[in-house]
Amino acid sequence: MGEVRRPDRVAEAIREEVATFLSEGAKDPRIRAFVTVTAVEVTRDLRHATVFVSLMGDDADKKSTTAGLASVASHLRSQLGKSLRLRSAPEIHFRTDESVARASRIEHLLAKIRDEREAQEPAQDPAQDSSQDASVEASDAPDKAE
């Protein structure tokens, strides 16, 4: 199993710190959408960190939040330098992660297809099912006249 690479450990620590910062300390009024930190990737030299975020809200809120996140990146970088005790805190780059929205859309489409199929299938009467089962059992029974 080998040890975990240092950039991976730093990325996980950054993910936790950014999530805490956004839920408790982000004072930018442009950050109006619900923000979830989905992942963080850090370069080997620890100079750059790409923070992937999922944004929930309408398009205007998402656009505003994206601008707000870019604005707080430098403040967040200084906070990370203090809390993670790194010689040089990585430069923060925010990227929108569309995978959560895409997965939600796919789930919605699958549910719609399932509902349409259920609506198209004729509802079978349970009494008909039992009479059909009885006739099948009678035809499968061996002849006793032999």
From Swiss-Prot:
The keyword Protease does not apply. The keyword rRNA-binding does not apply. It is found in: Cytoplasm. It comes from the Bacteria. GO terms for molecular function: ribosomal small subunit binding. Keywords: Cytoplasm, Ribosome biogenesis. Its main location: cytoplasm. GO terms for biological process: maturation of SSU-rRNA. It holds the Pfam family RBFA. One of its GO terms (cellular component) is cytosol. Residues 113-146 are annotated as: Disordered. One of several proteins that assist in the late maturation steps of the functional core of the 30S ribosomal subunit. Associates with free 30S ribosomal subunits (but not with 30S subunits that are part of 70S ribosomes or polysomes). Required for efficient processing of 16S rRNA. May interact with the 5'-terminal helix region of 16S rRNA. Monomer. Binds 30S ribosomal subunits, but not 50S ribosomal subunits or 70S ribosomes. NCBIfam families: rbfA. Belongs to the RbfA family. This is Ribosome-binding factor A. The lineage of its organism: Bacteria, Pseudomonadati, Gemmatimonadota, Gemmatimonadia, Gemmatimonadales.
